Amino acid sequence: MNLPQNIRYRRYQDWTEEEIKSIKTNVALSPWHTTYHIEPKTGLLNDPNGFSYFNGKFNLFYQNWPFGAAHGLKSWIHTESEDLVHFKETGTVLYPDTSHDSHGAYSGSAYEIGDQLFLFYTGNVRDENWVRHPLQIGAFMDKKGNIQKFTDVLIKQPNDVTEHFRDPQIFNYKGQFYAIVGAQSLDKKGFIKLYKAVDNDIKNWQEVGNLDFGGSKSEYMIECPNLVFINEQPVLIYSPQGLSKSELDYHNIYPNTYKVCQSFDTEKPALVDASEIQNLDFGFECYATQAFNAPDGRVYAVSWIGLPDIDYPSDSYDYQGALSLVKELSLKHGKLYQYPVEAVRSLRSEKEAVTYKPETNNTYELELTFDSSSVNELLLFADNKGNGLAITVDTKMGTILIDRSKAGEQYALEFGSQRSCSIQAKETVVNIFVDKSIFEIFINKGEKVFTGRVFPNDKQTGIVIKSGKPSGNYYELKY
């Protein structure tokens, strides 16, 4: 949604109680509110931030502008969970209220240090000529949720980057704290800078150099870089803006991607023997994925189910965006697998055999098996007129096609209404999670993933098996 600059950057304290009440009333009217996904109470949700473990709980923040479905003066909202499924929102913790983040508390990461959670984020500052000055800054959050912002800038804007320098991720590698930051060079090329904490002092960062990860020459910006280690093998997850489609087949405005690497050379610095760039998700909406190595030895990730610069049907209700289910990451035969955490099964009600359902609550999971050498088509969000989200699983040719051209209110049509990927031509297992206006589809327990939104009318709640004979179960999901 396009709103004037003076509205988007209006100070929080200048919004009246009456205006805020009006926004809340409008949000409440939406027919598309999710049940088991995180979405904003009001306004815009975008990047997940600060995904971490602290004080005996998982902590997950998200970017928010609470006054409408637009990218305005950003703050951080905090949520916490014991099982990575049931999240409790505790409120706004980082406001754009200092000289170092006056025009937005932008994205970042978090790490437990002692009895506090270190928040490492980008402060967005604009001068009187509206020139942006990005600052990498920090804060501590204590166990009661109190915030103490650092007075000094942790990483200033280097001389070799433009105003696009953001999204710091802190991580611990062999006992040493490092950070990577997404950047744009002066000749408008995307890259990543690596820093190390001198003597592991998180208030004293030293540049190591530009990280060599076999990046492209076509991307003009790297957003939201995340480096995690799966069985000690480095995996880089990032969002390259401007990537040439000759290098990667994608259809969204910007892709979310990854590379699997063999080792991490902290001296060069480099990610050694990086794989070819791969799509993290083949669906319509997945961006700014944030992942971290948890104390339990697992690697977890969560994504923004949305994209920059796109208008959504929910905008008219003064809100936009949601976060994906939390996914556990693993490597199999050099491929990245992502699959919802085990605790998602706790949402299941009694299982039913998959069959035609003229009506559902649009809050369910399907677990389906498709025989080899078969062609199958399902309709979800279906009405009695043949409309719905069409899912074709062709195990004969080895393809999956998702078509939302007849599913709910149409939007972002300039980027097409179909998405597809190749699969092995064999028996295929598919898990589909539907939540009012969200679908997440996992192929063969996370080998391929499709994430997207559908904004149905009140009659589009059915499930239809148009062709083929998939076997499996239907579970109503209750949060």
Swiss-Prot record:
Substrate binds at residues 44-47, 63, 106-107, 166-167, 223. Gene3D superfamilies: Exo-inulinase, domain 1 (2.60.120.560), Glycosyl hydrolase domain, family 43 (2.115.10.20). The active site is at residue 47. Pathway: Glycan biosynthesis; sucrose metabolism. It is an enzyme of class 3 (hydrolase). Its EC number is 3.2.1.26. It is found in: Cytoplasm. One of its GO terms (cellular component) is cytoplasm. It catalyses: Hydrolysis of terminal non-reducing beta-D-fructofuranoside residues in beta-D-fructofuranosides. Keywords: Carbohydrate metabolism, Cytoplasm, Glycosidase, Hydrolase. GO terms for molecular function: beta-fructofuranosidase activity. One of its GO terms (biological process) is sucrose metabolic process. Belongs to the glycosyl hydrolase 32 family. This is Sucrose-6-phosphate hydrolase. It comes from Streptococcus mutans serotype c (strain ATCC 700610 / UA159).
